[in-house]
């Protein structure tokens, strides 16, 4: 990587650290969403840098659907223990009681109950007035038009027509009681930036991002990994061992892998240099209907 590229990453790093510090200084009760993925790992690393040698002055929150990959949960708990940050884990109790499952209820309803409603429950429970998220503008078209400080009303809903101008990187965090701001310090990063930064900073990631032989079935054009015995096979489906990795991580029945031999960070970066599709192509929830992500965000999803 040439010096110009390194400078570019340092500029992104400085911008993100500035945003994280601004939120910590401006809001009464911020929280950092921790989804365990690569973007969350970078955001956590930046937060640790922002307040080093002190501890991160706000908790991390994971909204657990009970359907995450087992390796993700193991990584989450190991990371929390290693760095000693406060980790809050919330599961929607109503969703658990009804046995909410992507197999039984479908991707759209499962995501709404276990993710969107679960998130809103947690934000209300703890009274957070700002919540960091790891979304980037290059991921998806609705995220491309979102502000760094994204205003949410008392119902946690997002109205893209009711947002504040952000001139010269000046952010408006004024909110009334019950309102909140979703904050996206990685807004201007690309997927390639994320991987190059992970490589340069030696950031730990969930092993699922690296290619390995894994049991998968092909369903709806996606390779779904069989992560536990809850995976229900449809007629004609056969479990195969393939060398795959994940560009994005979510609930395992709703997350597609890609065939790959990239089992190192440099291998992933080489793949990203020639990639022509978004990582969100591997998320079943983004294909529920046209404009699916924007609809979910309007309802309170990140």
Swiss-Prot record:
Quote the protein name from its UniProt record.
Answer: Sulfate adenylyltransferase subunit 2
Q: Which gene encodes it?
A: cysD
Q: What does this protein do?
A: With CysN forms the ATP sulfurylase (ATPS) that catalyzes the adenylation of sulfate producing adenosine 5'-phosphosulfate (APS) and diphosphate, the first enzymatic step in sulfur assimilation pathway. APS synthesis involves the formation of a high-energy phosphoric-sulfuric acid anhydride bond driven by GTP hydrolysis by CysN coupled to ATP hydrolysis by CysD.
Query: Source organism's superkingdom?
Result: Bacteria
* Molecular-function annotations in GO: ATP binding; sulfate adenylyltransferase (ATP) activity
Q: Which residues form the signal peptide?
A: none
Which pathway does this chain act in?
Answer: Sulfur metabolism; hydrogen sulfide biosynthesis; sulfite from sulfate: step 1/3
Assembly behavior: Heterodimer composed of CysD, the smaller subunit, and CysN.
Q: What is the lineage of its organism?
A: Bacteria, Pseudomonadati, Pseudomonadota, Gammaproteobacteria, Vibrionales
Per the record, which residues fall in region Disordered? Answer: 280-302
> GO biological process: any one?
sulfate assimilation
Q: What class of enzyme is it?
A: transferase
E.C. number, please? 2.7.7.4
Q: Which reaction does it catalyse?
A: sulfate + ATP + H(+) = adenosine 5'-phosphosulfate + diphosphate
């Amino acid at each position: 990587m040439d010096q110009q590229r390194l400078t570019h990453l340092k500029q992104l790093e400085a911008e993100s650290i500035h945003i994280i510090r601004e939120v910590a200084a401006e809001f009464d009760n911020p929280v950092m969403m921790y989804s365990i993925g690569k973007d969350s790992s970078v955001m956590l690393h930046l937060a640790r840098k922002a307040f080093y040698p002190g501890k991160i002055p706000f908790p991390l929150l994971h909204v657990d659907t009970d359907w995450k990959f087992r390796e993700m949960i193991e990584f989450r708990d190991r990371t929390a223990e290693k760095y000693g940050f406060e980790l809050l884990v919330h599961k929607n109790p109503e969703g658990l009681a009804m046995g909410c499952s992507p197999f039984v209820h479908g991707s759209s309803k499962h995501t709404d109950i276990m993710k969107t409603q679960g998130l809103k429950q947690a934000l209300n429970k703890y009274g957070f007035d700002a919540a960091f998220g790891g979304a980037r503008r290059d991921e998806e078209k609705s995220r491309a038009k979102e502000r760094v400080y994204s205003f949410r009303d008392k119902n946690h809903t997002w109205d893209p027509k009711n947002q504040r101008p952000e001139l010269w990187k000046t952010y408006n965090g004024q909110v009334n009681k019950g309102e909140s701001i979703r904050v996206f310090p990685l807004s201007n990063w690309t997927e390639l930036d994320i991987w190059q930064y992970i490589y340069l900073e030696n950031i730990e990631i969930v092993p699922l991002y690296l290619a390995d032989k894994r049991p998968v079935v092909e369903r709806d054009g996606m390779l779904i990994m069989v992560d536990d015995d809850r995976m229900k096979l449809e007629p004609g489906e056969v479990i195969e061992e393939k060398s795959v990795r994940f560009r994005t991580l979510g609930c395992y029945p709703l997350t597609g892998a890609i065939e790959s031999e990239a089992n190192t960070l440099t291998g992933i970066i080489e793949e990203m240099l020639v990639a022509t599709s978004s990582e969100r192509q591997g998320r079943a929830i983004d294909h529920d209907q046209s404009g699916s992500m924007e609809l979910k965000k309007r309802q309170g999803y990140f």
